[in-house]
Amino acid sequence: MHAMKLTAPGGLDQIHLAEIEPREPGFGEIQVEIKATSLNFHDYAVVTGLIPADDGRIPMSDGAGVVTAVGEGVTTLAEGDRVLSYFFPNWAGGRPTLPDLLGVPGDHIDGFAAQTVTMPATAFSRMPANLDFEAASTLSCAGLTAWRALVVETALKPGDWVLVQGSGGVSVVALQMARMMGCRVIATSSSDAKLERLGALGAEHLINYKNHANWGEQAFELTGGAGVDLVVEVGGPGNLPQSISALAVDGCISLIGVLTGWAGEVPTAALMTKNGRLSGITVGSQADQANMIAAVEAHDMQPVIDKTYPLAELTDAFRYQESQQHFGKICVSL
């Protein structure tokens, strides 16, 4: 079968098509024919060497497919079931511990850039019944990250204000989920064309941050001076001064991305004045994923997919991601 492998120390020119032998499932394991995967910044960081990975690692943390064989002792899944991977296969629920955050596919272990995988049955949930494989594959990292920020960590209510930044996978699905919850959304982007699309998805106010350097202050004013209850922070340290300006008293900034840099200064006095919280978010638990899937099914939410590439063109998919031209998610079909 075909798989894409990464030659250490990484780089987009170090992703190669390889032939590997599928492995029969052992006790507690299932074999899954992977139908689709989707790109996340985490995957980009792995393949470019920002996150070191073993030589020969099969990348990609998201996977959706069909169970083709079941090992002894498996009772939760059966042959023919449509399944979706967990980003953290060891994190069942509750607050995370360090061991919960280990074993990430495509990083700590081989991932889903392969036509067939054999893994513990506990590495998969059922797929949303209303989605195809490509759409489902967008949820296990980006979708669950947005869900945890909006629902698990913040417990937003209808009418609350949410600020989303840009038009990447997490930001777009966060906008969709926020509107699904009855929240009001302010969206920022450097592209008027993308802002128009964000508006069509339900963003109430649109800010081109290239034209408005003090976009946080503008967002604060657009709420009538109340401020936003949640900032879905994908930019990281370079954005924090404006994100804090946008924040309501007792609001939360969910830090889920570091596009402006891995480290930087935090205007702590401004955050304290707002009685605000800066909360790091890395995806979510298996219990969170079950709740997210139930909501996606109940509301028939359809993730936004920009482009889909074949497996052999995974490098091209990453180059397109690198160009930042995409709106929503980039998928790979196997």
Language-model segments: residues:
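Glycine-rich phosphate-binding loop and adjacent beta-alpha segment
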Residues: 100-102, 181, 192, 198-199, ...
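Residue-level marker of beta-strand positions
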Residues: 64-66, 82, 116, 161, ...
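Adenosine-nucleotide cofactor-binding segment
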Residues: 164, 179-239
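Glycine-rich beta-strand-centered segment in the early N-terminal region that forms part
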Residues: 21-37, 47-92, 108-110, 128-130
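NAD(P)H dinucleotide-binding glycine-rich loop of Rossmann-like/cofactor-binding domains
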Residues: 87-165
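C-terminal capping/lid region of NAD(P)-dependent oxidoreductase domains
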Residues: 225, 300-304, 316-334
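N-terminal Rossmann-fold NAD(P) dinucleotide-binding loop
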Residues: 171-172
